[in-house]
Amino acid sequence: MATVHEIEQRLFSWAPRESAMDWDNVGHLVGDPEQEVERILVALDITERVVQEAIDCGAQLIVSHHPVMNVRWHEREMQTLRPDTRLGGVLTTLVKNAISAICMHTNLDAADGGVNDCLAKKLGLNDVFLLNDEKIGRIGTLSCEKGLEEFLRDVIELLGCGGLRYCRGSGRVHRVAVGGGACGEYIPQAIAQGCDTFVTSDLRYNDFLDTRGLNLIDAGHFPTENVVCPTVKAYLEEHFPEVKTVISTSHRDVIQYYL
């Protein structure tokens, strides 16, 4: 039976640790590296609900995209390990139930076939290539040019968005940049690369002020990244066929829209 360490190393052969941002926290973050794994739960985040789902389904390992702990987001919480905090409660429950956690974040964003390639594929982009040297983001073209309203409807349907925010630029959609998760900082690069549209998430008000003709679409953090989970599942099944791998059904987008 495969161990947590063996699974981590196999995932790193797809999405190397070295390709993660220097502030990121990736790899095996919780549990015994020599623990044998019979069942894996794949999820975008490791929340209380996801941990309970892992307990209920008998998983020894959760493979997530977002790190269960990262000093960039959890600096104060990481100073203690208390079950009465959100992070402390998650970590305590994982350890008590001998459930390990492997997290593949910005290294999976950058990986061939990772988050951004999955997002580009889901949106039907062709001739996909890198948006930037960091490999966070992709550019591709639609088979046929579309009007913005038609493309917005496609994004909602294909990604399962509850809604989206957007700013009209040229109003036509053909050459599209994508950035799963928070990629507003790459708007100038999308413009410089001649894109007419950029699909990403977590955009600020100021991001929408100077788009210079770019159709800017905030499709949500969860919808733009959750597309990678089936690919992670397929990768694990290919390399560890003896291990049962399932995608979380309890974890959904926590952001809702009132229209």
PLM feature spans:
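Active-site catalytic microenvironments in core metabolic enzymes, especially phosphate/sugar-handling
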Residues: 1-259
